Amino acid sequence: MEIFDYDNILLLPRKCRVESRSECDTSVELGGRRFRLPVVPANMKTVVDEKICTWLAQNGYFYVMHRFDLDNVQFVKDMHAQGCFASISLGVKQPDYDTVDRFVAEGICPEYITIDIAHGHADSVKNMITYLKAKIPAAFVIAGNVGTPEAVIDLENWGADATKVGIGPGKVCITKLKTGFGTGGWQLSALKWCARVATKPIIADGGIRSHGDIAKSVRFGATMVMVGSLFAGHEESPGKTVEVDGELYKEYYGSASDFNKGEYKHVEGKRILEPIKGKLADTLTEMEQDIQSSISYSGGKKLMDIRKVNYVILGGDNAGEHLLM
């Protein structure tokens, strides 16, 4: 198995078939809905809040609300009241089961539920998927996070409708340093490896540092790409604004950091400051245009045409072997 990450790969262009990149369709389908981009902001406290999630849903983007200090049932009611789809995160502890019971008792069904724990290839996740499928069968269940084909096969067999792939490749994640495990440094290979066995959508989570990495993720099997640091640090971002030497920054920290947990126990995340980079809508527009360009370079008109291109692995003597021609 070849090992590579985003920096080691370049996609090879094919003959362009469009007059303008604006003809290229960046939309993607997930759980019976079509979204404008194959991109979803990370379900982290410094990336999304109720206001951002509402705006994303109203403007045709996918979102996943975080699960920290939040009344999930009220959140779903609020989203439905505004005519929006509801997409929430759950853990695997007793309060999460209680939340599911409240949904059932009140006859409420979130359209998307993401079971979101650091090591998602676990019996605890199997049990939660089984419970959700029995209690709220209409919900589209995303489960993760995982980093191996065995995990993807198991999660799909347990009933997950999509899997989230990525263990520790994120900018504020220190899992590989703290534990010695993960996909940090080879996330793109791990995605390719997992996608080979997947029969349902994969959400690639973590390691995205530029818009081109989104196209690379789609090429190697992602339906949707979860992005944290590129979405943190906007004017609307919920992170605290910090001034350093006259420059404005937003706080961005990992979900398993002591900043998020409020205690120093089982810490696998850190805090950084992201320079404030304008409005979220502008970044999403730029992302859309860049992905349209990627599609035009792929010789196609639709997002999944990116999957047909060849690629080279940089930095190895054997780069030529990987041309698929």
Curated annotation (Swiss-Prot):
Pfam families to which the protein is assigned, alphabetical: IMPDH
Residues bound to NADP(+): 202-225
Active site: C173
Top EC group: oxidoreductase
SUPFAM superfamilies for the chain: Inosine monophosphate dehydrogenase (IMPDH)
InterPro entries according to UniProt: Aldolase_TIM, GMP_reductase, GuaC_type_2, IMP_DH/GMP_Rdtase_CS, IMP_DH_GMPRt
Keywords, in A-Z order: NADP, Oxidoreductase
Reaction(s) this enzyme catalyzes, per UniProt: IMP + NH4(+) + NADP(+) = GMP + NADPH + 2 H(+)
The family this protein is said to belong to: Belongs to the IMPDH/GMPR family. GuaC type 2 subfamily.
Domain of life: Bacteria
Stored NCBIfam families: GMP_reduct_2 (TIGR01306), PRK05458.1 (NF003966)
Transmembrane segments: none
Keyword hit for Nucleus: no
Organism in which the protein naturally occurs: Acidovorax ebreus (strain TPSY)
Name assigned to this protein: GMP reductase
The enzyme's E.C. designation: 1.7.1.7
MF (Gene Ontology): GMP reductase activity
